[in-house]
Amino acid sequence: MTNLRKTHPLMKIINHSFIDLPAPSNISAWWNFGSLLGICLMIQILTGLFLAMHYTSDTLTAFSSVAHICRDVNYGWLIRNLHANGASMFFMCLFLHVGRGIYYGSYLYKETWNIGVILLLTVMATAFVGYVLPWGQMSFWGATVITNLLSAIPYIGTTLAEWIWGGFSVDKATLTRFFAFHFILPFIIMALVIVHLLFLHETGSNNPSGINPDSDKIPFHPYYTIKDALGLMFLLLVLLTLALFSPDSLGDPDNFSPANPLNTPPHIKSEWYFLFAYAILRSIPNKLGGVLALLASILILLIIPFLHTANQRSMMFRPISQTLFWILTANLMTLTWIGGQPVEQPFIIIGQLASMLYFMLILVLMPLAPLFENYMLKPKW
C-alpha cells in the first residue's frame, strides 16, 4: 500500500498534498481554517445539491417549494438549515482565514493571496445570488437594491442592470438565471481552490514567526490531520447547534413573507456577513461613490502585499502593528453593526467615521507603523 500511495499517478498527488506534505512544525490553530473552508464547501455543495432536487426557480412557486422542502421532504428542514447556517460558518472561517493572512504576513505569497481574493469575491457572489432564491421579501428587495447599483455606472449602467435582470425589473428571468449562477459557481470555486492550493504548495506554508521554516518541517499526516480533525469537531458542533436549536437566528424575519414588489420592507439589509460592505456603501451619499467604495473595500486586499514596509514578515513581534490590526478588527465589527441599523443619526455619522478609518488603517497607518518599528529595531550603540 505504501508503494501504491507513492507511485500511483492519482494517489501520488493526494500523497504529496495531504499525507507526506512537509509542514512547518510550529503552525498554530489559525492555520486550521483552510481545511475547515474546504469542508464548508463540501457541506454546501452536498446540501445544495439535495435542495436543488426539490427547488423550483419560478417566481410563482419558489417560495412554496422552499416551504415544501421544510415540511414534506424527509429531513428537508435539516438540509435547508445546514445550508443556510453553513453559509454563515463559511464566511466566519473566511474572515478568520483572511485575518490570519494579514496578521502573519501570508499575503507575501502573492499568487496564493490573489487567488484567495478572487475566491472571496466568488464566494460573496455565490452567497448573494443564493440569498435571492427563497423569493421572500428580503430576497427580492435585496436583489433589487444590489443589482440596481449597476445603474450607477456611467453611460452603460441602466443597460447593464436590465441585461442582468432579463427585463425592466427583478422578475422571473432574474430568479432563473440566479439559480443557474448559484448552481455553477461552487464548482468554479472548487477549481479555484485547487489553483489556490497549487500555488500554496509551490512555496509551502507560512508560520507564526514569519521565519523560513525549511530547517524544521514535519509530515502533514498524522500531525496536522489530527489537528484539523479537532477543528472539524468544533465546526460541526457550532454548525449543528445553530441548525438544530436556533436555525433562523441569523436570518431576517421579513424573508418569511413571500416577495411583494408593491410593499417595500421598512429596512432593507443583507445577511450579516455582507453588512460591513453594506455600511461602507451607505456611508457615501453619492450612488456611484458608494459603489466604488463598496468595491474598494474588498479589492483593497489585492494591494496589501505592496504596502508591506516591515523588515519582519509576521506581526508576532510588532506590537504597534498588532494594535492597529485589532483596531481594524473592532472597526469591521462596528461596520457590521452599523450595516444592520436604520439610516438615521447617530448611525450615519458612526458609519462614515468607521468607513474612513477602515481605509485609513489599511492605506496609511498600517504601512507607516512598521517604518517606526524598523527604526526601533536598529541597534542604537
From Swiss-Prot:
GO cellular component terms, semicolon-separated: mitochondrial inner membrane; respiratory chain complex III
Compartmental location: Mitochondrion inner membrane
UniProt-listed Pfam families: Cytochrom_B_C, Cytochrome_B
CDD domains: cytochrome_b_C, Cytochrome_b_N
A Gene Ontology biological process term: mitochondrial electron transport, ubiquinol to cytochrome c
GO molecular function ontology, one term from the record: metal ion binding
Residues engaged in binding heme b b562: 83, 182
UniProt remark on cofactor binding: Binds 2 heme b groups non-covalently.
UniProt keyword terms in alphabetical order: Electron transport, Heme, Iron, Membrane, Metal-binding, Mitochondrion, Mitochondrion inner membrane, Respiratory chain, Transmembrane, Transmembrane helix, Transport, Ubiquinone
Function: Component of the ubiquinol-cytochrome c reductase complex (complex III or cytochrome b-c1 complex) that is part of the mitochondrial respiratory chain. The b-c1 complex mediates electron transfer from ubiquinol to cytochrome c. Contributes to the generation of a proton gradient across the mitochondrial membrane that is then used for ATP synthesis.
Family according to the record: Belongs to the cytochrome b family.
Remaining remarks: Heme 1 (or BL or b562) is low-potential and absorbs at about 562 nm, and heme 2 (or BH or b566) is high-potential and absorbs at about 566 nm.
Name of the featured protein: Cytochrome b
